[in-house]
């Protein structure tokens, strides 16, 4: 076989083997060196290929797809800085335990360190953020096809392993590498007769669920039984099954539940949200849990962590399905590597406890909910707080909600509306490394993975940061409904001490952008609306949520008004809480 033939065969085997693992979504960025990989993916009948001129957007799209499905999408790119553009999403995927497969094309050995064009050191580029990386040899007849296939199998296994995450395969290609038609038996396929007949991967890696030791379960049960003031914290949970089990445990034991917005439990009306209560110093002064069971990943709000840090509980137990350390304040006493939902089920007692604790919190929570509903009523101004609350109450249960970092996720965490009978949508966000980049692309990937429309709540700076990802919206199978909260800058910095440094604040932190989001929508051919009241926002979003095409709703405000509104609303909530304590 000549070089073109063996290169074509290798790439076909790679794509075919990935498909046999159920991996069909390919995110391809155009390039010359990656031609054989692109051609193999495009010509495989089982693939679903999306083209991304921007590699950064491709990687964040793959991230969103993985969050929705638990499966990796495959990234294909050419050599040079192309692969480096994947880095931010690879970091997020690593910290969020989400699988991604990177196939980067590279130059042959003799071009390195010679000044050859578009040639950088790509092997190991992602460092400790990849679960595994390897540089394949150049395609060669001397290498058995089984070696190539089993390497692909291992890469898939590592990406889905414990914990899941990004895997990088760097593949050098020597010219000429343009694909050719192959016919007849190939020398190195002779031993693959069974593989060709059964449509199964050459080998699989069985994934086992993490089950806690019985002694650990019994010890945790004993601590729960003896605790006088226990608290359950639900951090980031991507599985609704896990969320339901943890919510059921809190309800059965009559234990207060701190449900983070990323837990899939925050909008459930069966539990009183603690985020608004922690705004009150009187409440935090009396809030002194002696046992904390923290299920899942990290949480958004700082106030709980501050309260716990000031009065550390005797026992602070973290249960998550990852061996990654979670102990930012160094007060965790026991970390258990287990499936959160399965572990929660093991803690459920035979008899339920009385609901006096939850009822007392529920009465206070109901008054807070009433106050926030009045704040969003007709005739009131449309603010960032009311936008988040109205949106949380209106989004269809069958849709997905992606919340961008900075102010949107904090507002949703604190002020989200409660919904009856667990009817909340799936909530997703990039909280692994909590960057503001790639949010539009991630939300687009989430929509395609879920197979449902997704609403994205995002600030103006994050929106502009990922503006080119609006190109994705034209060819999407599922629409993305974008709500942009535009306060002309980085609104979150107005809440920080640096805001008092008037000589440097506006230029260096406020960063007014003064760009037209309406013009951006027109440029990319996306429908646009800009409501100015709660009533018009509700009408605009109701129309958009029923639409089969993507659209943008812009909510305008100012950073000064936003700061004042947060202070005013939080003061009203504190007054309500303080009257009850």
Curated annotation (Swiss-Prot):
The keyword Manganese applies. Its cofactor is Mg(2+); Mn(2+); thiamine diphosphate. This is 2-succinyl-5-enolpyruvyl-6-hydroxy-3-cyclohexene-1-carboxylate synthase. It catalyses: isochorismate + 2-oxoglutarate + H(+) = 5-enolpyruvoyl-6-hydroxy-2-succinyl-cyclohex-3-ene-1-carboxylate + CO2. Its EC number is 2.2.1.9. PANTHER family: 2-SUCCINYL-5-ENOLPYRUVYL-6-HYDROXY-3-CYCLOHEXENE-1-CARBOXYLATE SYNTHASE, PROTEIN PHYLLO, CHLOROPLASTIC. Homodimer. Binds 1 thiamine pyrophosphate per subunit. InterPro entries: DHS-like_NAD/FAD-binding_dom (IPR029035), MenaQ_synth_MenD (IPR004433), MenD_middle (IPR032264), THDP-binding (IPR029061), Thiamin_PyroP_enz_TPP-bd_dom (IPR012001), TPP_enzyme_TPP-bd (IPR011766). Catalyzes the thiamine diphosphate-dependent decarboxylation of 2-oxoglutarate and the subsequent addition of the resulting succinic semialdehyde-thiamine pyrophosphate anion to isochorismate to yield 2-succinyl-5-enolpyruvyl-6-hydroxy-3-cyclohexene-1-carboxylate (SEPHCHC). Belongs to the TPP enzyme family. MenD subfamily. The keyword Metal-binding applies. Keywords: Magnesium, Manganese, Menaquinone biosynthesis, Metal-binding, Thiamine pyrophosphate, Transferase. Pathway: Quinol/quinone metabolism; 1,4-dihydroxy-2-naphthoate biosynthesis; 1,4-dihydroxy-2-naphthoate from chorismate: step 2/7; Quinol/quinone metabolism; menaquinone biosynthesis. GO terms for molecular function: 2-succinyl-5-enolpyruvyl-6-hydroxy-3-cyclohexene-1-carboxylic-acid synthase activity; magnesium ion binding; manganese ion binding; thiamine pyrophosphate binding. Pfam families: TPP_enzyme_C, TPP_enzyme_M_2, TPP_enzyme_N. It comes from Chlorobium phaeobacteroides (strain BS1). GO terms for biological process: menaquinone biosynthetic process.
């Amino acid at each position: 076989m000549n070089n073109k033939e063996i290169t074509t065969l290798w790439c076909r085997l790679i794509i075919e083997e990935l498909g046999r693992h159920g991996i069909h979504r390919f995110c391809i960025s155009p390039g010359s060196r990656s031609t054989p990989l692109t051609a193999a993916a495009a010509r495989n009948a089982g693939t679903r290929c999306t083209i991304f001129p921007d590699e950064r957007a491709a990687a964040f799209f793959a991230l969103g797809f993985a969050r929705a499905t638990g499966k990796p999408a495959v990234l294909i790119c050419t050599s040079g800085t192309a692969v480096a553009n994947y880095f931010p999403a690879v970091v997020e995927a690593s910290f969020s335990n989400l699988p991604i497969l990177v196939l980067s094309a590279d130059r042959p050995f003799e071009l390195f360190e010679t000044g050859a064009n578009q040639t950088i050191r790509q092997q190991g580029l992602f460092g400790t953020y990849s679960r595994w990386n390897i540089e394949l040899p150049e395609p060669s007849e001397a290498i058995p096809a089984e070696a190539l296939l089993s390497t692909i199998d291992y890469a898939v296994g590592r990406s889905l392993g414990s914990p899941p995450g990004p895997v990088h395969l760097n593949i050098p290609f020597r010219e000429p590498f343009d694909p050719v038609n192959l016919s007849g038996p190939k020398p190195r396929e002779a031993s693959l007769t069974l593989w060709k007949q059964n449509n199964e991967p050459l080998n699989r890696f069985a994934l086992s669920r993490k089950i806690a030791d019985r002694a650990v379960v019994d010890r945790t049960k004993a601590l729960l039984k003896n605790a006088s003031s226990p608290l359950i914290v639900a951090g980031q949970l991507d599985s609704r099954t896990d969320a339901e089990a943890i919510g059921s445990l809190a309800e059965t034991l009559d234990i207060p539940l701190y449900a983070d917005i990323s837990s899939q439990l925050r909008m459930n009306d069966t539990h009183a949200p603690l985020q608004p209560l922690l705004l009150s110093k009187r409440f935090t002064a009396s809030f002194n849990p002696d046992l904390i069971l923290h299920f899942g990943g990290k949480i958004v709000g700082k106030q709980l962590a501050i309260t716990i840090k000031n009065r550390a509980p005797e026992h602070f137990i973290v249960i998550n399905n990852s061996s990654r350390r979670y102990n930012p304040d160094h007060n965790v006493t026991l970390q258990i590597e287990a499936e959160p939902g399965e572990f929660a089920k093991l803690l459920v007692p035979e008899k339920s406890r009385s609901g006096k604790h939850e009822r007392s919190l529920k009465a206070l929570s109901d008054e807070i909910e009433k106050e926030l509903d009045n704040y969003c009523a007709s005739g009131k101004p449309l603010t960032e707080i009311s936008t988040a609350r109205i949106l949380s109450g209106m989004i269809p249960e069958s849709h997905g909600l992606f919340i961008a970092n900075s102010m949107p996720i904090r507002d949703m965490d604190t002020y989200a509306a409660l919904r009856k009978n667990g009817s909340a949508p799936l909530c997703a966000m990039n909280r692994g490394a909590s960057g503001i980049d790639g949010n539009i692309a991630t939300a687009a990937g989430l929509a395609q993975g879920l197979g449902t429309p997704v609403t994205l709540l995002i600030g103006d700076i994050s929106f502009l940061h990922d503006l080119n990802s609006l190109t994705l919206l034209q060819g999407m199978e599922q629409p993305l409904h974008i709500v942009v909260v535009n306060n002309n800058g980085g609104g979150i910095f107005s809440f920080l001490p640096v805001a008092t440094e008037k000589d440097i604040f506006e230029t260096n932190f406020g960063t007014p952008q003064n760009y037209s989001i309406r013009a951006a929508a027109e440029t990319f051919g996306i429908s646009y609306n800009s409501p100015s009241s709660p009533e018009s926002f509700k009408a605009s979003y109701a129309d958009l949520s029923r639409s089969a095409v993507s659209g943008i709703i812009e909510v305008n405000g100012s950073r000064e008004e936003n700061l004042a509104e947060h202070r005013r609303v939080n003061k009203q909530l504190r007054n309500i809480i303080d009257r009850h304590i």
